[in-house]
Amino acid sequence: MITAIVLINTAQGSTAEVAQALIGLPGITEAYSVAGAYDLVAIVRVGDHEKLADLIAGRVQKVSGIVATNTLIAFQAYSQRDLEAMWDIGNDEPIR
């Protein structure tokens, strides 16, 4: 499974419409409006790199209202659950 994070700039006033269009595409599991240099962040999960290329170049970049994209391919996933297990040394007594 390939996971990618797509950073998206949208035309002024089109962020909500772009987000709705994106979440309708197969492979895009989530879309977030964000503050900062980008307007949206989309999370993509697909089976292989060819499907990722088809989705980004063939469908995402053609969504009306998208000005630019920057795609980041994830190498390793970390979550709070993973971090808690990593730092658990087996001592459940509170620190005093």
Functional labels for PLM-detected ranges:
Residues 1-96:
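A compositional/biophysical signature of low hydrophobicity enriched in polar/charged and small residues
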